[in-house]
From Swiss-Prot:
NCBIfam families: small_GTP. This is Rac-like GTP-binding protein ARAC9. It holds the Pfam family Ras. The gene is ARAC9. Interacts with SPK1.
Length: 209
């Protein structure tokens, strides 16, 4: 499968398929930064809690136009009652944790998966570890000696545990694997793995214009 994206806040009348993609995870793990980085190729230098407006991007997939709807959610407990309203009609969840935050990693299985499976039991999940640039920075352990980082093997184990269809590590600040996150989200919706051949599924490359 090949895909190219033309980011636009206006839906195309020629779009044949709509995919609603919702980001979920603890507060301050970088969900909003991920969306801003993907749609504008910029990185906000200051933390601002969930100010990303719902955004539509027209994506060309194998010659057909797909309208990708991106929804941001707030991870703080104050939003526990209103957050599930965003789950209605979701086609895929991007479930994010920070690679430099053990609590956000542990909350994936403790809090977020139970919540998603309660409100949207059949919607596929793409597990995403954010802030890989900090995790891989040799100065980080020196600057934050008490921090407990998460490594790829742990992320893959969590993916298997929760039944996510993919695991990707990314850095919004460094623009590393940002596009790959959303490419994967599109793929799991358009080409869901069969129950018998899930592990044999081959995934093509996507290209952004």
């Amino acid at each position: 499968m090949s895909a190219s994206m033309a980011a636009t806040s206006t839906s195309s009348a020629t779009a044949t398929t709509f995919i609603k993609c919702v980001t979920v995870g603890d507060g301050a793990v970088g969900k909003t930064c991920l969306l801003i980085s993907y749609t504008s190729n910029t990185f906000p230098t200051d933390y601002v809690p969930t100010v990303f407006d719902n955004f539509n991007a027209n994506v060309l997939v194998d010659g057909k136009t797909v309208n990708l709807g991106l929804w941001d959610t707030a991870g703080q407990e104050d939003y526990n009652r209103v957050r599930p309203l965003s789950y209605r009609g979701a086609d895929v969840f991007i479930l994010a944790f920070s690679l430099i935050s053990r609590p956000s990693f542990e909350n994936i299985a403790k809090k977020w998966v139970p919540e998603l499976r309660h409100y949207a039991p059949t919607v596929p999940i793409v597990l995403v570890g954010t802030k890989s640039d900090l995790r891989d920075n040799m100065q980080f352990p020196k600057n934050y000696p008490g921090a407990c980082t998460i490594f790829p093997e742990q992320g893959q184990e969590l993916r298997k545990e929760i039944g996510a269809l993919a695991y990707i590590e990314c850095s919004s600040k460094a623009q590393m694997n940002v596009k790959a996150v959303f490419d994967e989200a599109i793929k799991v919706v358009l080409h869901p793995p069969s129950k018998t051949k899930k592990r044999k599924r081959k995934i093509g490359l996507c290209h952004v214009l």
